[in-house]
Design a protein with these regions (language model features):
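Short, basic, glycine/proline-bearing loop/turn elements
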Residues: 31-36, 79-90, 190-196
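Residue-level marker for buried hydrophobic side chains located in beta-strands
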Residues: 5, 34, 61-62, 115, ...
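Active-site neighborhood of divalent metal-dependent phosphoester bond hydrolases
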Residues: 46-49, 54-169
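Divalent metal-coordination and catalytic microenvironments
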Residues: 8, 37, 64-65, 102, ...
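N-terminal active-site segment of His-dependent metallophosphoesterases
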Residues: 1-51, 55, 68
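Acidic, His/Gly-rich catalytic cores of divalent-metal-dependent hydrolytic chemistry
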Residues: 131-267
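Active-site environment of divalent metal-dependent phosphoester hydrolases
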Residues: 11-14, 40-42, 66-72, 124, ...
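Active-site-proximal beta-strand elements of phosphoester/diester hydrolases
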Residues: 2-10, 114-120, 239-240
Length: 267
């Protein structure tokens, strides 16, 4: 049995299938874990969603910002943008079944010694705290008041963690850390404006670049940051978003041996 973690799929269904064939993925014996953003921007989000759901217990995922965006649109609290490619899902006969299934997933998964998140874990949280805070958001997603969560999900403030935060501000910041973060200060103040670079001006650094971050001894697998192109980010860090949606390959990581496999459809 092999556990595979795949980076951002974003509706690139053909590349996903090609990649799984390349590693000889067998859903009867292997597991596929997605590091978030399985939908949006690519041409086949509906096919991707249906396929992942069809894998049953052989599939797990953490939610990314695009997955949450789809759910917010479906709830009627957000309108699609011109860049979104979610129309087919929203109009599908099985839309509600797919959306309900998607909404059940967490923001953080532990698979053996590996922790999978979409964007990262801020430097001021250790793994135990991250797990507890991820569960707070998951509880909101699973509650009958989940529409309230989506109504207040969007926004860049507050931008720094304070344990006394409550309500929608608290949930928004936790969600932003797990699904949108790239750069932050040493104490975790977010810069959500800088999206396309791999460097930032003082006092900001990549979240994983802070040497004293409290999760440094944990093996963290993440996606989200296509500009990194899957670069080596340091010990215990595994970046899987290789920018498939932008013309790069799609990447999968074998958790049994930490080997990467990339796949790209030739033009």
């Amino acid at each position: 049995m092999t556990d595979y973690v795949v980076g951002d799929i974003q509706g690139c269904f053909d590349e996903l299938i090609g990649l799984l064939k390349k590693v000889r993925f067998n859903p009867d014996t292997d597991n596929l874990i997605a590091a978030g953003d399985i939908v949006n921007r690519g041409p086949k989000s509906l096919e991707t969603l249906r396929f992942c759901k069809s894998l049953g217990k052989s599939f797990q995922m953490v939610l990314g910002n695009h997955d949450l965006h789809l759910l917010a649109i479906a709830k009627g609290v957000k309108s699609p943008t011109s860049k979104d490619t979610l129309h087919d899902i929203l109009k599908a006969s099985d839309a509600q079944i797919l959306l309900d299934w998607l909404q059940q997933h967490p923001l953080l998964l532990n698979i053996g010694e590996y922790t999978i998140v979409h964007a990262g874990i801020p430097p001021q949280w250790d793994l135990n705290q991250a797990e507890l805070l991820a569960k707070e958001v998951q509880s909101a997603l699973l509650s009958e008041q989940s529409g309230e969560f989506f109504t207040h999900m969007y926004g860049n403030e507050p931008s720094i963690w304070d344990s006394t935060l409550k309500g929608t501000d608290r949930l928004r910041l936790i969600t932003n850390y797990f699904t949108r973060m790239r750069f932050c200060t040493e104490v975790g103040q977010l810069d959500l404006q800088n999206k396309n670079s791999i460097s930032a001006n003082f006092p900001y650094k990549a979240w994983f670049a802070w040497g004293d971050r409290r999760s440094a001894k944990s093996k963290i697998v993440f996606g989200h940051w296509a500009a990194l192109k899957g670069m080596n980010c340091g010990e215990n860090l595994f970046a899987l978003d290789t920018g498939c949606i932008w013309g790069g390959p799609m990447r999968v990581m074998n958790l049994n041996n930490e080997e990467y496999t990339d796949y790209k459809i030739s033009p």
